[in-house]
Regions:
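Short, small/polar-rich loop/turn modules that mediate ligand/substrate recognition or access, typified
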Residues: 164, 169, 226-228
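A glycine/serine/threonine-rich, flexible loop-to-helix segment
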Residues: 91, 165, 178-200, 240-241
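Catalytic loop of short-chain dehydrogenase/reductase
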Residues: 95-101, 129-165, 177-178
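Short C-terminal tail/terminal secondary-structure segment
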Residues: 216, 227-241
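The beta1-alpha1 cofactor-binding region of Rossmann-like NAD(H)/NADP(H)-dependent oxidoreductases
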Residues: 54-65, 210
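Conserved mid-core segment of classical short-chain dehydrogenase/reductases
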Residues: 83-103, 144, 184-188
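Conserved glycine-rich cofactor-binding loop
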Residues: 11-13
């Protein structure tokens, strides 16, 4: 389709599949990641239409530095960077550590989207879209991670109102359990996995391609009247009305 697309956290999992989908559609894609080797390897594997940039989307200085590498116009921004940072930290032993663990999760999952969107905003082309990856945890609860993803949904509602007059849309996709990602950092037990699948209506885990397909739809002309929404993609594990 010859669009220009940015996908944060594009070196693996959902972000990689999203970038692959846009590349297959004929779009130019810039993927970002915190570490040079994996993001550059991902771009090389995805093909010549995909470029890589090293950036921690939660770090204002790194996002500021990234702006020099951004294309002049952007049609699609996918805020995918994030994840439950509690898996990377020991349990808090006091209030200082508790505050730090919450701030890290909020930075990774909410502030990263806010910063990237602010950086890209002047480049967003009319008819474009901002799509952020939320989580079922925003509704079912998961401590700091769930709170951060709930905040993402609330922020998106205001963002949609701001961008609407410029013919831009903004939506959140809230995945449930998605296999073939590193979300659980190897800590997912067989019993927990079975319970997550049993909770679905269709009896299967989600895949990165399920989320990528939803992203591509929201970025398509068919979705131009969808904005300010949270789209649940969880196999019926959590239903909305």
């Amino acid at each position: 389709m010859n669009r220009t697309v940015i996908v944060t956290g594009g070196s693996r999992g959902i972000g990689y599949s999203v970038a692959a989908g846009f590349a297959a559609a004929g779009d130019r894609v810039l993927i970002t990641g915190r570490h040079r080797e994996p993001v550059e390897a991902a771009a090389a594997a995805l093909g010549p239409s995909v470029m890589a940039a090293v950036c921690d989307a939660s770090d204002p200085a790194e996002v500021e530095a990234l702006q020099a590498a951004l294309p002049a116009t952007v049609d699609v921004l996918v805020n995918n960077a994030g994840g439950n940072t509690d898996f990377d930290r020991p349990e808090a032993r006091d209030l200082k550590e508790l505050a730090a663990s919450w701030r890290v999760n909020l930075d990774a999952n909410l502030l990263s989207a806010v910063l990237m969107t602010a950086a890209v905003d002047p480049r967003l082309a009319s008819g474009g879209t901002v799509i952020s990856i939320g989580s079922i945890a925003a509704d079912k609860g998961a401590g700091a991670y769930g709170a951060a993803k709930a905040g993402l949904a609330s922020w998106n509602a205001g963002l949609a109102a701001e961008l609407g007059p410029r013919d831009l849309t903004a939506n959140v996709i809230a995945p449930g359990y998605i296999e073939r990602t590193e979300f659980f950092r190897g800590r997912l037990t067989d019993r927990r996995r079975d319970n997550l699948i049993t909770a679905t209506a269709n009896g299967r885990p989600g895949t990165p391609e399920d989320i990528a397909g939803t992203v591509l739809f929201l970025a398509s002309p068919a979705a131009r009247h969808i904005t300010g929404q949270v789209i649940a993609v969880n196999g019926g594990a959590w239903t909305t009305r």
